[in-house]
Structure formats: C-alpha cells, structure tokens
Amino acid sequence: MLYHSTRSEFAEVDSAQAVLEGLAPDGGLYMPRQLPCFDWKKCLEGSSMDMAAMILSALLPDIPDMPQLVKKAYTGKFETEDLTPSVPVGDFHVLELFRGPTSAFKDVALSMLPQLLTAAKKAKGMQEDIMILTATSGDTGKAALEGFHDVEGVRICVFYPYGGVSQVQRAQMVTQEGNNVAVCAVYGNFDDAQTGVKNIFAACQGKELPFALSSANSINIGRLAPQIMYYFRAYQDLLDAGKIKLGDEVNFSVPTGNFGDILAGYLAKQLGLPVGTLICASNANNVLTDFIRTGTYDRKRPLLKTTSPSMDILVSSNLERLLYLLSGDTKLVAELMGKLNKEGSYTVPGELLAKIQKEFWAAYCDDARANEIMGRVYADCGYLCDPHTASGWAAAEDYVAETGDKRAMVVLSTASPYKFPVAVLTAIGGDTSGSEFAQMERLSAMTGVPIPKNLASLQGKEEKHTGVIEKDKMLDYVLNL
C-alpha cells in the first residue's frame, strides 16, 4: 500500500517505510493514498487482538506476520484480556484505556509500535539503528519508554516540558531503566518540545547520521493505526451488552489535545464502523473547540496549565491528517500548515468546515467543571475518573443537552485517576497533603479502588534522568547521545 505526505502527492513510500520514517521529508504526515476495503462486521467477531491484527494488516500490509506481532505486543501486559474494557456508568459507557503497563491510553499504541518498527526494519533490510524522538505532555513519554526500552537496534529519547507534567508522570519517566533510553526536560511547554522534535527531523534531513530518525508520537502512522482497534472493541461491547443492534450508530466523546485519539475514531468510521458523532473534548486550552465551531485555528494565545496536562496543547498535529482526508488537497494542506507556522493561525474554506462539522462536535471543560464532574460521577455512580476523562464526560453531557441525540454514548477514559491524585482527591473531598504517593494511598483507602502496580512501585525508585535544557539545545542533546 502506498503512502504519501499530507502536503505533497509525490515521494510515495510503502507502509513499512512510512512507519520507519515517521514524518515525511516535507514535514507532512504520511497517509495512505486510498483507505482499504474492510470487512468491519467480520472484524467485530474476534478478540481485541484479532481486531488489532485485522485492522493493522489492512492499513500496514507491507509489514508481515501481523497476528504474531500483535500477540507479542499485548500478551500478559494488560490487566484484562480484552485490553480496553467498556463499563456502564450512569447514562454513558466508559471505555477504559488505562489498563496497560503505564496506566494510560498510549499503552495500546506504544506496546504495538516497537513490534511494527522492528518488523518494518527487517522487511526493508535496514541495518542502522533507529533513534526514536518523542515529545510528551505526560503519558506518551513513559508509554514509549516502556515499549522501547532494551529493544535491540533502537534507541529512544523523550523530551517533556519542565514543570508541565504531574509528579507521577515525571516519576514514571525519570526512573526509567534500560540501556537505550534518554529522558530530558525542556524549559518551555509541550508545543515547544513538539516543535523542537519536528525541527530536529528537518535539520537532519539529508544528513549522514549514525542512526535513522523516527517518532513515537502520533505523527507516526504506526502509532496512530493501533488506536483504531478500541473503537471496534467498544462497539462490540455495546452489542454484547444488548445496548445496540448491529448497524446502530454510536457516539464517542474523546478527550484530545493532539487530535490523534479522535482521528483514530474517524478512521474507524472510514473503515465501516457505524460511528455517529465524534465529540472533541478539550480543556481550557480550547483551540480545537474554537476551530471546529468557527473554522479558524489560532494558536496565538497563552498556554494554560490545567489539571489535565496531557491536553495542554495548542498545536494539534494530527488535525493535518483530517484536513487532508476531508479535502483531498495536499496543496491546500501545505498552505494552511505554512500559515500556522508563520502567522500562527489559518482559516479553512467554508466547504471544508461544513464537512468537519458534519462529522465532529466540540466542547471544552475548565478545571472547575472537571472537578465538579469527578466529584459528581463518584458520588452518583461510585466511579472514579481522572480530569481528562471528566473533560470527555462534560463534552458528552453538553452534546446531549444541546442536540437531544439519544444514540449510545461512549466516553473514552484515557488515564488512571491515580496519575492525578491531587485533582481526584480534591474533587471527592479528600485530604491532598503529602507527596503524590501518599495521596495515591489515601485515595485508595477512601475509595477501595486499588492503585495500579506500576504506579505503586514508583515510590523510592532511583531517578536516572534529571537533565533540563533550553529548547534550542534539543538537537545538540540528541547528537551527543
């Protein structure tokens, strides 16, 4: 299957090469020239691993032995056999994406990406090592480190914004073990770190290096594609529970900052899954809400620190893929991305905005509303959720209130509440004194919900990666590894 950049129809590569490169040479994102024909009903018949293998085989056909790769990626690493269980909570269904080895939704993709990358490397006869560069707003970093540590022929470097992740998220990264890993804080915010990574790719284009560069961010199609599976899993769970009939449309409310998680839902729909409205849930950094409502994307605003730091983002990289999918116009996408880079904003044509609004609805939730929802959902339903999930819940409530849509609603839960114990304890009226580890123990004692083992084991672990650099020193840091 041929892939090309969202910014140019030239320089086509096969799916294995697209995974290896991560980012196209012109700075665009790889997308298939045409999405494959797909038997979505057959896909629903299997286990979560069967679904993943079928979807990935269709989208990445140049990577062989996909069922074996999927088994190697997931077997024994998740708390539940179905990987991403759905549970009824109040009027909605919550899709729990935090049952993996780092308690965040990124585990689904970043358990799979190392297998895809090493298999693609073998398929292309590639000899040199790969250097994975990743910027993280909190969850991607640890999930990538967990997936890639000690993988032969691969090195990984993670950058995170200094002071811009929770204490638990930082502890997960700076205590990471492995002989091929590097973690470094960057003075600035997530957008600075993400832009820095993209600039490293651009600066190294065409240069001889002792390694090939790739990315574990969702700019890499090999990171995005595995996320499609859990939309199929959620749909089948609703079928099994008797909440829908085959063919009924289901709405999904998705907390998202970089637009990757919700784009996976749109790709699931393009593969045939009966997805209704995709609800884009933001926090107070509501650049995506404004865009979907008005057609103007404007990053010229202060980045706010919120209790949902994984969505503290103003430049949503995967939106570029949606613009390409709905317009089919690489020249337009290149023009819009150029404006965003140079002027800080762009406005899409009215016809394109109409297409976006036909598929997506958007709302945002500030910290106060998230706090109220976490407290109310726990009080009314006995369900503990984190601030990102609360944003998704808020957007789902707003959507139903405004539209009256009675189709089944799935809220994606992207992280364990134990990754954000201060916010969750505050919401349910608990004591927030002490370290985050003391807070986790207090939260568990209050609610009876066990602390994930991977988080409980962090206390007292040695910090191995404590460096902090200026954002303009990121390239030097990578070249000196």
Predicted regions mapped to residue ranges:
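PLP-dependent amino-acid enzyme catalytic core
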Residues: 1-481
